[in-house]
Amino acid sequence: MSESTYPSVKDLTLEEKASLTSGGDAWHLQGVESKGIPSYMITDGPHGLRKSLASSAGETDLDDSVPATCFPPAAGLSSSWNPELIHKVGEAMAEECIQEKVAVILGPGVNIKRNPLGGRCFEYWSEDPYLAGHEAIGIVEGVQSKGVGTSLKHFAANNQETDRLRVDARISPRALREIYFPAFEHIVKKAQPWTIMCSYNRINGVHSAQNHWLLTDVLRDEWGFDGIVMSDWGADHDRGASLNAGLNLEMPPSYTDDQIVYAVRDGLITPAQLDRMAQGMIDLVNKTRAAMSIDNYRFDVDAHDEVAHQAAIESIVMLKNDDAILPLNAGPVANPSATPQKIAVIGEFARTPRYQGGGSSHITPTKMTSFLDTLAERGIKADFAPGFTLDLEPADPALESEAVETAKNADVVLMFLGLPEAVESEGFDRDTLDMPAKQIALLEQVAAANQNVVVVLSNGSVITVAPWAKNAKGILESWLLGQSGGPALADVIFGQVSPSGKLAQSIPLDINDDPSMLNWPGEEGHVDYGEGVFAGYRYYDTYGKAVDYPFGYGLSYATFEITGVAVAKTGANTATVTATVTNTSDVDAAETVQVYVVPGKADVARPKHELKGFTKAFLKAGESKTVAIDLDERAFAYWSEKYNDWHVEAGEYAIEVGVSSRDIADTVAVALDGDGKTQPLTEWSTYGEWEADPFGAKIVAAVAAAGEAGELTKLPDNAMMRMFLNPMPINSLPTLLGEGGKKIAQFMLDEYAKLSK
């Protein structure tokens, strides 16, 4: 079948059109084979292909799937700050989809990490929408470059697991636009994902699947989305209402196609709307035909494992390295002239790695190499003691005693600690930010026996570090590293490569410092997003709240210097930032240059600064590079509920260039013209608002002149009276000036009508 002969919605009966808007089974589209529309498979991601062995029969089984490369989940990959690497991960995922005849992989998920207790934080990217959008777009573009579709999810405001199927997320328009929408918006406008998955929850009272404002007004009409919207599994509660709202596909099927047929015949759904939704499904099938027509394809297992390996390396964040305890010396294996350190490895995670999150994204890896496996493969000697079990049972004194004795005889101790899967998974939120008590107790015992301790963490979202950090000279946050985490950790720990990861999420000192905790996880079926736009570092940095490790933070074996920071205006409200970053060490390494915009005086409360650009520079020892980062108009804008639009105010802004939100190398200023937006003045506009408006200012001057001439009552000019006057709507002037105030107000309205014509 050639593209010119692809079927169209015009070729289908009413019943066939209706059938396209529901799945064929749990993992297949419903095709119309007689009209040349196949029933392609769609299945889970987002950090690799999870094709259930039962999926061919349309059944659901989260535990038994075909082998696929398990890449680092977004919790780790987001710390790479490397969109090019993420694009390679996307390409590899697509190749595995082609082998398994999967037309659409369900991911990436770009919901904001509103609270670190969120059970699904492991598969989301960041607390910052700019970073989330500019990283996750690599997955979308990489996958779709190979002819396989993605499903950007979960649109929108799916930020907790508690009551996730029905909770009403009550969010202000500004918070939606500035925090919870931008990652979706950026990817839609720049990459056009072929599908978007709507969320389970309600937003301001309306389920996402039935939300016309969300799925049509915003997504399609404002952002220009031209793909299809599918429901999360079981999120469509009213097929007719959802189809009218802009939902193309319910998953899994409810076997109620006849309801759609009757709704069209009864005039509840227009034929044109059904045609639009059904044609979208045909278009999706047509986009994937070429890739799904490739037979006997086999992806390169080893090459994909190497992509996973590189991704894992760049996901590791070094939080602490006192006394340069890292890198360790592996001895003759790495350096024939070196004397090896005697190494103790303690912690079950070194033998049984936690490499991915739990739930619908659970993958069967093509291979799995633990840290202990890697040491054995590389001929690096180390003594091992598990120290604890990965269940929720109390500490085992025998395991603890063995671990302490092992530590006593070592030059350095590597302790693999973290969160077992039982406390962190899709389906529920965590109830504490703390590491399991038995692991902390073991760390304290080991540190008492040997002061040279390096902690290697395995967790899908941040944990509190401060209470136990004094017991470790080094700390590596390795998140969940996928199937090649063992080799990646060995490369970093033994100095084959410098760590380059940066935090995509702030690490607070205490969970109660998080601004969302006042309303977490909600009550009586709803959750208020009372922190508004002050999520994550936007809150911590604006209000000077101490954190353990700030957003964007990450250490290196190298040292860097950022110099020559400059900003050049490229338009009325756009600019380009340039800077030179130099590797001032003798170690090859990478540094991420981060650009934050500091607003000037504004009509609304704005965060102290916001990430609006970044670039990762790979530098040889002693090398320098000049980087350039463009700032578009949106980089300076906020969402104005007054204008129901983005708004850039005129004035001076500051541009910060640094290596974390709290490590700024230099700050430069730029003056913007503003977008010139004004709101029509009315009797309810305050006197101060009239003064600030271009037309209003002329009228205020005319009022003053008329007062001097005795034509109008003279306005009071003392400071006290001005204090009352400025915030006063002009229809209240009579309360201050009597009949004279009434005449002034009418004069102002009459003059405004003339000037604004």
From Swiss-Prot:
Coiled coil: none annotated. Signal peptide: none annotated. Its EC number is 3.2.1.-. It comes from the Bacteria. One of its GO terms (biological process) is carbohydrate metabolic process. GO terms for molecular function: hydrolase activity, hydrolyzing O-glycosyl compounds. Completely inhibited by Cu(2+) and activated by Co(2+). Pfam families: Fn3-like, Glyco_hydro_3, Glyco_hydro_3_C. The active site is at D232. Keywords: Carbohydrate metabolism, Glycosidase, Hydrolase. Disulfide bonds: none annotated. Optimum temperature is 48 degrees Celsius. It is an enzyme of class 3 (hydrolase). Optimum pH is 6.8. Catalyzes the hydrolysis of a non-reducing terminal alpha-L-arabinopyranosidic linkage in ginsenoside Rb2 (alpha-L-arabinopyranosyl-(1->6)-alpha-D-glucopyranosyl) to release alpha-D-glucopyranosyl (Rd). It is not able to hydrolyze alpha-L-arabinofuranosyl-(1->6)-alpha-D-glucopyranosyl (Rc). Belongs to the glycosyl hydrolase 3 family. Homotetramer. PANTHER family: BETA-GLUCOSIDASE (PTHR42715:SF10). This is Exo-alpha-(1->6)-L-arabinopyranosidase. It comes from Bifidobacterium longum.
